[in-house]
A protein has these predicted regions:
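Gly/Ser/Thr-rich beta-alpha loop segments that engage phosphate groups in nucleotides
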Residues: 6-10, 93, 111, 118-122, ...
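Short, small-residue alpha-helix embedded
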Residues: 63, 115-146
Length: 181
């Protein structure tokens, strides 16, 4: 289940997100799904035995209680371990971190992807890969790499400043072909 894309900050959203934490299925929290837990990160402890993935950008990460001072990789690894979640810290060199301490920095992607909706594409890819049964860290790494590669293809074809999240979607098949053929 994916929660947060376009959710908004209206009254009741925070309580809704906290109630969804009790569901048994894998849960991906993005954007306002993460913001809804700000100040309530202890609620994640109820999900330690279930797959939970957070996909914040740096601002959402800090609002959720993350500390970037030790550097992005260390910060992501520490947060994932402390809260028992998988974390995809978006930004230059997106980081995927697992609760067991594993951490990966992604080499694909570019600054043209830093716009509203790009993270929604990533979150959708991630929840789709989890739905296919990929192990969580593999799903995180694959989604992040494919998302970044689709962004690199879009930048080459339409330019960094003109690319949109739809351009990412259009290039996912080409990115997939690069690793499957």
């Amino acid at each position: 289940m994916l929660v947060g894309c376009g959710l908004g900050r209206s009254p009741g959203c925070d309580g809704l997100v906290r109630r969804l934490l009790d569901l048994p299925r894998p849960l991906v929290l993005d954007a306002d799904g993460i913001n809804a837990l700000s100040g309530h990160m202890d609620a994640l402890s109820r999900r330690r035995d279930r797959i939970t993935v957070l996909t914040p950008h740096e601002g959402e990460f800090v609002r959720a209680g993350g500390d970037l001072s030790p550097g992005r990789e260390r910060a992501a690894a520490d947060f994932a371990r402390e809260h028992g979640v998988y974390l995809v810290l978006k930004g230059p060199g997106t980081i995927a971190a697992a609760p067991d301490g594993r951490c990966m920095r992604n080499p694909t992607g570019n600054c043209g992807m830093a716009k509203g909706g790009s993270g929604d594409v990533l979150a959708g890819m991630l929840v789709s890969l989890l739905g296919l049964g990929l192990p969580p860290m593999d799903a995180c790494c694959a989604a992040v790499w494919l998302h970044g590669r689709a962004g690199d293809l879009a930048a080459r074809q339409v330019g960094l400043w003109g690319m949109t999240p739809s351009d990412l979607l259009d290039r996912i098949p080409a990115a997939l072909r690069e690793v499957t053929e």
